[in-house]
Amino acid sequence: MSSVAVPFYQRRHKHFDQSYRNIQTRYVLEEYAARKAASRQAAHYESTGLGKTTCRLCARRARSLAHEAMQESRKRTHEQKSHASDEKRIKFASELSSLEREIHMARHHAREQLDRLAIQRMVEENMALERHVVEEKISRAPEILVRLRSHTVWEKMSVRLCFTVQGFPSPVVQWYKNEELITPASDPAKYSVENKYGVHVLHINRADFDDSATYSAVATNIHGQASTNCAVVVRRFRESEEPHPAGIMPFHLPLSYDVCFTHFDVQFLEKFGVTFATEGETLTLKCSVLVTPELKRLRPRAEWYRDDVLIKDSKWTKLYFGEGQAALSFTHLNKDDEGLYTLRMVTKGGVNECSAFLFVRDADALIAGAPGAPMDVKCHDANRDYVIVTWKPPNTTSQNPVIGYFVDKCEVGLENWVQCNDAPVKICKYPVTGLYEGRSYIFRVRAVNSAGISRPSRVSEPVAALDPVDLERTQTVHVDEGRKIVISKDDLEGDIQIPGPPTNVHASEISKTYVVLSWDPPVPRGREPLTYFIEKSMVGSGSWQRVNAQVAVKSPRYAVFDLAEGKPYVFRVLSANKHGISDPSEITEPIQPQDIVVVPSAPGRVVATRNTKTSVVVQWDKPKHEENLYGYYIDYSVVGSNQWEPANHKPINYNRFVVHGLETGEQYIFRVKAVNAVGFSENSQESEAIKVQAALTCPSYPHGITLLNCDGHSMTLGWKAPKYSGGSPILGYYIDKREANHKNWHEVNSSVISRTIYTVEDLTEDAFYEFKIAAANVVGIGHPSDPSEHFKCKAWTMPEPGPAYDLTVCEVRNTSLVLLWKAPVYEGKSPITGYLVDYKEVDTEDWITANEKPTSHRYFKVTDLHQGHTYVFKVRAVNDAGVGKSSEISEPVFVEASPGTKEIFSGVDEEGNIYLGFECKEATDASHFLWGKSYEEIEDSDKFKIETKGDHSKLYFKHPDKSDLGTYCISVSDTDGVSSSFVLDEEELERLMTLSNEIKNPTIPLKSELAYEVLDKGEVRFWIQAESLSPNSTYRFVINDKEVENGDRHKISCDHSNGIIEMVMDKFTIDNEGTYTVQIQDGKAKNQSSLVLIGDAFKAILAESELQRKEFLRKQGPHFSEFLYWEVTEECEVLLACKIANTKKETVFKWYRNGSGIDVDEAPDLQKGECHLTVPKLSRKDEGVYKATLSDDRGHDVSTLELSGKVYNDIILALSRVSGKTASPLKILCTEEGIRLQCFLKYYNEEMKVTWSHRESKISSGEKMKIGGGEDVAWLQITEPTEKDKGNYTFEIFSDKESFKRTLDLSGQAFDDALTEFQRLKAAAFAEKNRGKVIGGLPDVVTIMDGKTLNLTCTVFGNPDPEVVWFKNDKALELNEHYLVSLEQGKYASLTIKGVTSEDSGKYSIYVKNKYGGETVDVTVSVYRHGEKIPEVNQGQLAKPRLIPPSSST
């Protein structure tokens, strides 16, 4: 037997070979094989019989043998089946018992394993708790016990940096080189890291010159972090091995790929332009560059400069050059990044460069009104525990002035910033003390003004707190054979214990708030580390005060604060080491705290000159006192706005600056202020106002030179004017010609040509000529155009017309444009009948004809163009002979509307003149506004007048009429194609004519037409309000065509300030029906308004007037200011209330209902002005007419409220709303009749609109389901509940605006419990109804005189008839002649006592009971003797029964 235990899940699996896969199949196969064998045997016999002659006996015998063999085979097969079945049964029984044993063993093992796991888990939890307690006790943040030490080593030496740190959990240590993480895996030959028992070591193998850096170690765990750093300086062994300047090699080396000695041709395909950005954004300046030839391993050097300072890859800037692009990316913009950026492509052939200015605006302040962030934070004069931080102040153009700065420091590798100064420092320089030697720090600065604190500046470059003198305290000694020995000066000083005093104590920085003292360490100084103590004394005091008594200074620098302003001080310094303190140094000269650097004076005269369409050049004179200037800030303002904006956000050092981002055509003024460390100068005087326009230059060259006609001796040329006139009007053109294949050009005209068409005379027939044209303005003559095609001087005789010329594109919009041209000079043999316009996209070859039929106009609007595509156009003239020559192809036109495109607008001026107006901000002094009608220049001065002022132009219509309808256009020269058109149709002209007529013939505008209002006394006021009325305006009222005058009946007045004219009629009667008109005149302006008061309108105002008069009279005595109204309180009470006024003590107030007075518990307090009547628990009986009356000697008033009908229903709805909010959840109450669902409310009335629902079906009240309620409850009675009554029940009460639902799920256990309780109560009620009981007849006490006969009779009841037994003193009464008992008709029971004696006194009881129970009634019998006083008995009290429960068998 194998010793290996079989798993439980494998023991349950049964394994069979092929023979046991299916026993039944195996038996079938065996039987089939036997039959097959018998069949073969029989066939064999038959075949044998065919071959031989066999007798019948032999054949019968053979068949008998075969039959026997078959029977034997069947018998054997049956026995095998029976045997197999027995084996199978035995096998299954054995396996079942084995399976039961295995299951039992598995359960046992599982129970043991579960117990083992429970015990193990308990032990682990206890151990974890104890471990957590222990860890909490020993947990602490990292603490550095031994810090890193700086090293100065020679090249090729190894450096071992080590420090000790403790903390729990064990800190994770990371090493940094100049803030970059050191990963030993990246350079395993250079770095290796060790950690043994908290001592961490960084090995730097074979240090070279590049390993000089600041190394930091940062230890971190979950409780905090700590860091230490040091400096490693690697020096070369020989001075001759210092690296040579670039390009000077002492021996031949492979040249670097960055050194370009191959000639390249560099072209800038796309340059970066002036850019505006905001602090905190990311930005990339890009230039597309074409370098020829393009070599993979050799290319030009791309250098980026900011204000002529080379930019290198850093945390803030990323450089890229490749794939035809040079890019400079800014990861996080700050104002430090503002400046003039230049990209220089350095090649052998020279330098190609492009420049543009980057402006960086302040980010949004965290606090409104706070200043911008300072910039350019730098560190100077770093030492062991001291550094001076400087910065540049922000420009505060629109903010309050800066009152000081806060300086923050942070140790490199950490993120916790610490504020260095408690009070804001006034100047842009601050000495930071208290640094830890060997650590590296970064700094930032925040500005403060009266509004708050600015955002922090960009952090400074890291600076290490090291003494630079330590590196100089080594000395080189030259020995024979060229060897050198490096020794430290400490080794030469001998054994010095107490150091000498410092020397050369002086003030290196003096300001109003502090003095920085500097000194030289003592010589000799000794080998022990030195510290210093500083003492000060006010001149004349005679006493010395130690400044740093608590903390010694390690650096030979110290900033002394807390000095009295204006008082001179002297200072001395003492050096100290572990052996003692030196003598004091020599006393300094008296030093007085004061600002050495003063605020600069204001810059001088500021001059602004034109530069481009969006920029202006600003120049100024430098201030008289410009010492220690940081630079200048320039501000600009739109003339008249008085709002100044900063032009630059970082001080510039030169006195000429180009201000960008200005709006074309706007006028600006400029001012400049100087800035240094102390602050800002006063603003300079403002410059003269200047309009932003491009500077005056020579015009650009003409283009599109076309031959328009030729007669064999002369040629007529046409051309297009230059795109840009240079800022001043073009005075004319100069033409040069030359014959083909000639070198020299010849002047055609000596004087300027004012038009763009000219006929060149004295030409040779059949010769070829080319021409070039130059334009001239006041600045000079511009560049000539490119030479034209070669034109042959041969007379034109073709019948078709010549080419159109001067194609001009205007009104370019997103999907359309307008094409203009001039008629051909050569018309052909017949007049021109029209023109065909063709166009195509630049990249296609097929031309498209825009108009199927020739147009007779010399303009055409081309539509259905694609936005963003570029097209070219040409025009062909047509006459009777056919289509003539095509014009020159126009310049490519990009179809897209320019941003800010403006259109012609129509209007009417203050004098009523109709005009068309246009505004063009891009217009310059040289621009002309050219108005046209149907694209023909307007020259008719009789019908039109043109006025142009600055960038606005208007076309006035002198005598507008229908002949002025049409299309008007305008184009502005010397711009980038600014043009527009306007269709003046009949509807628009009519609108303008109407508006013009209103202005020329003015009407007084009215705020409101003539209206009326009825005043409190029944007076009627008629009034009208105009927009405004002058004091000289006149008015009059007309009633039924008769003017009325101001008097007692008609009081007429006018409020000129508000424009109100009114007339008040004291008594308005039936005679006043008619038409009312008011007429107003104010200068030339007139207006009137009428009001018709007849028929129903008059009756309405008359009725209202009478009503107001009655109301006025009513209010003269006590009256109701608010008549009776009702409201529902939170307690579901109805409150009838009214408000009263003008009462006095004698005023009487009463309540009535249906004419009868109502008695109230407390008389109302009329002084409060309110009276209330409470109706609790409202019902139908409270319906009626309620009335309140007020009366005194001045009169009386009545208010009535009919509380019935709709009013009653509204109150019920209001009660439903208040009561519905207090509805409780549905509750179940079981009774003998069934199950009752109840909802309790503050108030319930059966007239409230409520519904009960079962399974979302509304329930109607009936025998099965009864709906009812009481004063504070609504219920649903389910009689004889069954299973069908299960489900959700909903009670909903409706108010006027909302409803309130309560739901109960009567199913499951809730229904079962309720049904059981109902059945119990039903049975109890049935038993109570049918049990045996005494209905009445027996008194509580009976008194009788002895000798009398006592008869106690009562009526009993029970179903079935009860058993009746009498007792005396709780014992069964023995019946005899003295005691007689009878029961008649099963319900009348009596006890007769004959001859009563005193012994018969006692308690008698009657016991009545059937199967449902019964009761016992006690009667006390008192017998007295003759002559005794009769005992007092309370008469009329019946005996109280005692219940008897039913027998347990019932």
Curated annotation (Swiss-Prot):
Tissue: Expressed in pectoralis and cardiac muscle.
GO CC terms, sorted: M band
Domain Ig-like C2-type: 142-233, 254-359, 899-995, 1002-1115, 1118-1204, 1225-1322, 1333-1422
Keyword set, alphabetical order: Immunoglobulin domain, Muscle protein, Repeat
Matching CDD domains: FN3 (cd00063), Ig (cd00096), IgI_M-protein_C (cd05891), IgI_titin_I1-like (cd20951)
InterPro entries (UniProt xref): FN3_dom (IPR003961), FN3_sf (IPR036116), Ig-like_dom (IPR007110), Ig-like_dom_sf (IPR036179), Ig-like_fold (IPR013783), Ig_I-set (IPR013098), Ig_sub (IPR003599), Ig_sub2 (IPR003598)
SUPFAM superfamilies tied to this protein: Fibronectin type III, Immunoglobulin
GO terms classed as biological process: sarcomere organization
Pfam families recorded: fn3, I-set
Cross-referenced PROSITE patterns: FN3, IG_LIKE
Annotated region described as Disordered, given as residue ranges: 66-87
Highest taxon, organism lineage: Eukaryota
Domain Fibronectin type-III: 373-468, 501-596, 602-695, 698-800, 803-900
Function: Is a structural constituent of myofibrillar M-band in striated muscle.
Name of this chain's protein: M-protein, striated muscle
Lineage: Eukaryota, Metazoa, Chordata, Craniata, Vertebrata
